[in-house]
Amino acid sequence: MPPPAEEFAVDDLDEFESRLDSFLNRFHADDLRRILLPDPDGKLHFPLVIDFAELLEFDPEVAHQLYDYPKDVLELFDAAAQRALDKFDAAARRADKRKAGDEPMEKKFVHVRVNTSGSPLECPEASPSIGKVRVKHRGTLLTLKGTVIRSGGVKMIEGERKYQCRKCKCRFTVHPELEAGNRITLPASCKSKSAKGCGGANFQLIEDSITCHDYQEIKIQENIQLLGVGSIPRSMPIILMDDLVDIVKAGDDVVVTGRLSAKWSPDIKDVRSNLDPMLIANFVRRTNELKSDLDIPVEIINKFEEFWAASRATPLKGRNSILKGICPQIYGLFTVKLAVALTLIGGVQHVDASGTKVRGEPHMLLVGDPGTGKSQFLKFAAKLSNRSVITTGLGSTSAGLTVTAVKDGGEWMLEAGALVLADGGLCCIDEFDSMREHDRTTIHEAMEQQTISIAKAGLVTTLNTRTTVFGATNPKGQYDPNESLSVNTTLSGPLLSRFDIVLVLLDTKNKKWDKIVSSHILAENTEEKKGKTSDPEVMWTLSMLRRYIHYVKQHFKPVLTKEAERVISSYYQRQRQSGTRNAARTTVRMLESLIRLAQAHARLMFRNDVTKLDAIAAILCIESSMTTSAIVDTAGNALHSNFTENPDQECILKCDSIAYLSKNIKYLTDEISN
């Protein structure tokens, strides 16, 4: 067993407690008075959150003692908070401000919670990754970041018992040891504070002296994106008690501050017991709403604004400069790069009249021959997303994608799968065709309703999966353009209809295209190409793209204009009336997809209004998914789509094409003539 930390000791305990009282009275008097107010929920435990940075500035010595000996100092802090609470309560009673019958119940359990945000305790030494926690951290105040992968049920455990010595009648309190499975160990002799001591070893339990607490165990795992290739993400069990229980669920991103301890592994015959590390939580902060750790400086935002100010005359040319930063090692594939950008940016989630949430995250599927760059797009998209999970269809089961029920210590718990862990981010599934049909059907609800309903091992619950699904698959055998997409991919119609964009990449013979691509690949490895840094696309590096995508998602909530609404409505009506329409694709989901993609394009163009241009861009993405199209030359095969020299002029020609196809709808014809 590792050597225990030195015991907590101060020269003058009374003086130390008075310093704690001074801190609470100065900074948290209003919080304590608020706790005294009548509570409609009838809670027994009340948190009092203090700021470690504030404490460090007020009294550095107390702050250092709190870091070195959190268990002892937090007990003194709780006692100080209770004294202050009693003092304020007595003052209120003397002032006679309460009406008769308005007496609140006695509030005996106040817990001081330490928030280390913005303090020196966010340094790597006091806030290491889970995989770097060592014995030297034992007993200290530690802050860990991770994702909840397992959440146990709420239990009730004993918090303390009071005993009385049969010899001298001295009363004392005994606390259970969490490290030893909540076992209570009586002292060897009486704890009498008399000079001689009675030496008694026979104790009697005082009736009605047992205090119970809520108790929950969760497990958090370190962020996969921060690990190198081949590294296994480590996990750490966390103990939550009292007001901290049941505030997080599987899939949540959390920051946990607590005391690092250890517990004995379960007793198994002929197996050596070991000490497993665990964190006894003092404060838990959910960071789901703050998923991005990107700190975007004002200078970068000014660069974005200057870029679009310079591109005001030719906005589509500016958009293409951004798109060229996506997978720059792959030549061309304009349609795919545009689709990737729109998928990552996404639309705006809204609630319809019936109260049902309509998702804003689009889904995308790449269907293509081997060697067409599908996996490279998946990996690059994962790098652009602030939170992502990459998996393959062959190595994924329905439980691994959704939620697994695992048994731990005689109790069933839920362990989050890939879609739950990617909540608020991106889930990339390569080799989509390798998944079993049963496993594919389990993600239907996750893709459309963005939840997963679970009924396993007596556990019935619903978890959020607000994630974008980006899949890649190979066609079944030789791709046949005359057959439907469902036949070529062996994917069911209901699953295909959930993908907003389905792009087909066919490696067909094209002498001109092969020559251009080979020249591009060879030029990438020449000294002349390596020395060039004057390209306008150099601005859009991976880091800059991540910041741009995050910024436009947070600051732009585009709304459809009348022109965009009419364009989308006209196109949808024509698709529904077409005699050669694909029934699996031309559903109401197609209309919702058009709206999402148009909103995403408006965000990409740094706007809050969805214009006719955005609607046309969304239509072009949808048309590229079709087997045949009179609007897009590369329909049925997005591999040979390239960036044009004059995209703004090209857009006018596309408008003509869309108007021609929808000539039976008067509005579009009038728009083009104007």
Curated annotation (Swiss-Prot):
Any single GO BP term? meiotic cell cycle
Instruction: Keyword check for tRNA-binding, yes or no.
Output: no
Q: What is its EC number?
A: 3.6.4.12
Zinc finger motifs (C4-type), residue ranges: 165-198
Which transformation does this protein catalyse, written as a reaction?
ATP + H2O = ADP + phosphate + H(+)
What positions belong to coiled-coil segments?
none
Motif Arginine finger: positions: 497-500
Describe the task this protein carries out: Probable DNA helicase that may play a role in DNA repair during meiosis.
- Gene3D superfamilies in UniProt: 2.20.28.10, mini-chromosome maintenance (MCM) complex, chain A, domain 1 (3.30.1640.10), Nucleic acid-binding proteins (2.40.50.140), P-loop containing nucleotide triphosphate hydrolases (3.40.50.300)
- Which domain of life does this protein belong to? Eukaryota
Q: Which family does it belong to?
A: Belongs to the MCM family.
InterPro entries, from UniProt?
A: AAA+_ATPase, MCM, MCM_dom, MCM_lid, MCM_N, MCM_OB, NA-bd_OB-fold, P-loop_NTPase
Q: Which GO terms describe its cellular component?
A: MCM complex; nucleus
Record organism? Oryza sativa subsp. indica (Rice)
Q: Name one GO molecular function term.
A: zinc ion binding
Domain MCM per the UniProt entry, residue ranges: 318-521
Q: Which Pfam families match?
A: MCM, MCM_lid, MCM_N, MCM_OB
Q: Sorted alphabetically, which keywords does the UniProt record give?
A: ATP-binding, DNA damage, DNA repair, DNA-binding, Helicase, Hydrolase, Meiosis, Metal-binding, Nucleotide-binding, Nucleus, Zinc, Zinc-finger
Name the UniProt record assigns to this protein: Probable DNA helicase MCM9
Where ATP binds, per the record, is at 368-375
